[in-house]
């Protein structure tokens, strides 16, 4: 690493998960390279209890913002002008103790890289979700394994929002931000942001960056709104040019098929009927020329 280690900030946008957020902050204790600071932007004041914060090695700062993942993440960006790298994590992502140290090494060694991400070995977002205890055990098992050789980088289309780090010099030089026309949970906001940043460097994934994503279901938005966003947001991104037509149409088709084929046999943790209804409403709006990500605010 360089003589002056990179200053890395951690940003967490959160909504309706006060207890889970507290557990996640506790998991940031003991990083082999402590964060320069941790910024938490809650959707509502009561979503973040800052009365008794753990010692993560740097200050934990409350950031205020209007509700909405993109707006909250942009508010965090505005507070990290003194840092080199910003790592966004979900409020239910537990990074391994060496995560920040490895991340700093990657950004120093690869000056052409602008976004680094990883796809967790254990990701509750793809199923019913993982428990806190499961995540702790997975981290323990990982720590007991021999340290692997540094994994190579692999170029990828976009960063994964649950752990997405960005080189801040690129962000500020080109005035890059999350698109606040994607309201509330900002479906596919990580793809949109990544493709905008990708114009200025490489977007890579590195599996040696280990963490566990619980995929907590508490605090999720309605199925109807999500279903609408599954159509409206890719259409919006394709039209503005941040998402390829091939990628966007594949996203829409995949979600339509999933929601329809599982309509009568849905997973207990997924509102397939609500999502299918939202898909249908968005397709109707697309047909009459009024489809827009912001329409979910009316549903």
Which residue ranges define each predicted feature?
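Active-site donor/metal-binding and catalytic loop motifs
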Residues: 181, 185, 202, 206-224, ...
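Short, well-formed alpha-helical segments that are part of the catalytic scaffolds
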Residues: 12, 16-30
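Acidic donor-binding segment of Leloir-type glycosyltransferases
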Residues: 25-63
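Active-site nucleotide-sugar/metal-binding loop of Leloir-type enzymes
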Residues: 70-85
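Short, flexible, basic/aromatic active-site loop/helix in glycosyltransferases
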Residues: 135-157
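Conserved donor NDP-sugar-binding/catalytic core segment of glycosyltransferases
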Residues: 98-132
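Non-catalytic, C-terminal membrane-associated alpha-helical segments of glycosyltransferases
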Residues: 225-233, 244-299
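A short, conserved alpha-helix in the catalytic core of glycosyltransferases
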Residues: 158-166, 170-176, 180-209
């Amino acid at each position: 690493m360089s003589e002056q280690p990179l200053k890395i900030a951690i940003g967490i946008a959160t909504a309706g998960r006060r207890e889970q957020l507290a557990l996640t902050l506790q998991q940031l204790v003991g990083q082999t390279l402590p964060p320069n600071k941790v910024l938490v932007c809650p959707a509502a004041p009561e979503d973040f209890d800052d009365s008794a914060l753990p010692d993560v090695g740097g200050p934990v700062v409350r950031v205020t913002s209007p509700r909405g993942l993109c707006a909250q993440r942009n508010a965090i960006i505005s507070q990290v002008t003194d840092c080199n790298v910003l790592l966004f994590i979900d409020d239910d992502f537990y990074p391994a103790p060496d995560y920040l140290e490895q991340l700093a090494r990657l950004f120093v060694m690869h000056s052409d890289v602008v976004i680094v991400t990883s796809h967790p070995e254990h990701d509750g977002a793809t199923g019913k979700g993982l428990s806190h205890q499961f995540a702790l055990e997975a981290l323990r098992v990982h720590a007991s394994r021999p340290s692997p050789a540094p994994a190579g980088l692999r170029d990828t289309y976009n960063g994964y929002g649950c752990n997405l780090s960005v080189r801040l010099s690129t962000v500020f030089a080109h005035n890059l931000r999350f698109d606040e026309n994607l309201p509330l949970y900002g479906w596919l906001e990580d793809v949109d942001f990544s493709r905008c940043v990708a114009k200025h460097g490489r977007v890579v994934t590195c599996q040696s960056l280990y963490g566990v994503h619980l995929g907590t279901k508490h605090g999720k938005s309605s199925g109807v709104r999500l279903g609408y966003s599954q159509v409206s947001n890719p259409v919006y991104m394709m039209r503005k040019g941040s998402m390829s037509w091939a990628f966007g149409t594949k996203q829409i088709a995949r979600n339509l098929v999933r929601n329809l084929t599982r309509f009568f046999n849905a997973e207990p943790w997924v509102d397939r009927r609500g999502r299918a209804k939202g898909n249908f409403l968005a397709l109707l709006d697309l047909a009459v020329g009024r489809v827009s990500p912001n329409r979910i605010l009316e549903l």
